[in-house]
């Protein structure tokens, strides 16, 4: 791939990520789904009620909807690193719980197929222990309600 087309590919991937943030905040999960392969796999490490491996649109979609309950994001403070068929995004977010609002950086590692669709996603919070704590507090609060 020549340098110009590599630059264009990187710009497309970055633009799609930014567009997906907007879709995430608007709860337009169909728009996010269109950027993924039907057999997409998403991994979220940790010990929270959301951690695990999700496969396919339906499972990944349920995880994205659940993340929307606790994450706040905008288009600022994002950096991109490209390595072959993957893009690593460092993204500042807020995680909300019943008694918490914490800022942290989320690393999103996305791998792409030849058509430019996302085939795998790994979400890595900078402070996994705090991330899990806030998510589990949300679960406890919803169970108590």
What name fits each language-model region?
Residues 30-84:
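A solvent-exposed, acidic/Ser-Thr-rich amphipathic alpha-helical stretch
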Residues 55, 107, 123-124:
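Residue-level structural signal for beta-strand termini and adjacent loop
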Residues 75-81, 93-94, 105-112:
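Hydrophobic/aromatic beta-strand elements that line small-molecule binding cavities or substrate pockets
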């Amino acid at each position: 791939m020549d340098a110009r087309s590599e630059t264009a590919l990187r710009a497309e991937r970055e633009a799609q990520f930014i567009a997906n943030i907007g879709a995430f905040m608007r709860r337009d999960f169909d728009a996010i789904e269109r950027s993924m392969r039907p057999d997409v796999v998403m991994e979220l490490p940790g010990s929270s009620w959301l951690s695990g491996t999700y496969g396919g649109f339906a499972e990944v979609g349920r995880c994205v909807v659940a993340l929307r309950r606790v994450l706040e994001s905008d288009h600022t403070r994002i950096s991109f690193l490209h390595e072959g068929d993957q893009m690593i995004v460092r993204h500042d977010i807020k995680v909300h719980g019943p008694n918490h609002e914490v800022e942290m950086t989320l690393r999103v590692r996305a791998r792409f197929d030849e058509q430019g669709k996302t085939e795998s996603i790994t979400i890595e919070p900078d402070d996994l222990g705090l991330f899990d704590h806030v998510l589990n507090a949300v679960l406890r609060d919803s169970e108590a309600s």
